């Protein structure tokens, strides 16, 4: 497939890669992006340092209503069985209209581990964070207002098994294309060398 070749081509520049991702059909984009392994994700995260800065609207487009959920399908590079590397991050805009998003992680083990709630905000004004990505998915914070109907109950990430996965963690996000973002995980300000890709579902 053309897109799979583009993602594997280490000589391909960021603009050409973004064009290939944007040109693909939704099913082609999902299939190719969710097949990316650790080495490729690491390379793409570094490549995306030169990308146009992300905005919150890349996760929840401006035309979406408050508390309307937007699904992003994902694959991570954690040392887990294959099926557990696939997940969803679900985002929504709060009623207040403040420059932040609420979200949680829908995983095969969400009932066992917990939802991993977060607040996503721009990193502008945070000199230590800005070079890592323009948006941070911050697990130190959880929603403090209403979330979409049907989402799990909001609980802090210090509770239960979540402490092993989400507690004291932040994900720093970069843009690959209109629908595709890539993130790097940090624990207590330490880079974990773990990455994940997201494909927004429209």
Residue ranges and their predicted role:
Residues 1-202:
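Soluble ligand-binding/transfer domains with enclosed cavities or grooves
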């Amino acid at each position: 497939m053309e897109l799979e070749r583009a993602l594997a081509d280490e000589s391909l520049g960021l603009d050409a890669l973004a064009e290939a991702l944007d040109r693909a059909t939704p099913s082609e984009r999902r299939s190719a992006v969710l097949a990316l392994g650790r080495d490729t994700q690491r390379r793409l995260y570094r490549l995306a340092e030169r990308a146009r800065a992300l905005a919150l609207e890349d996760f929840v487009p401006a035309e979406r209503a408050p508390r309307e959920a937007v699904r992003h399908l994902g694959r991570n590079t954690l040392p887990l069985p294959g099926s557990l590397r696939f997940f969803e991050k679900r985002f929504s805009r709060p009623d207040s209209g403040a420059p932040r998003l609420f979200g949680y992680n829908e995983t095969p083990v969400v009932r066992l581990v917990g939802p991993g709630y977060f607040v996503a905000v721009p990193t502008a004004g945070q000199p230590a964070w800005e070079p890592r990505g323009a948006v941070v998915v911050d697990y130190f914070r959880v929603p403090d207002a209403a979330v979409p109907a049907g989402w799990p109950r909001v609980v802090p990430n210090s509770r239960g098994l979540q402490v092993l996965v989400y507690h004291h963690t932040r994900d720093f996000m970069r843009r690959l294309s209109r629908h595709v973002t890539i993130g790097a995980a940090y624990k207590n300000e330490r880079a974990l060398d773990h990455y994940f890709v997201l494909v927004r579902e429209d």
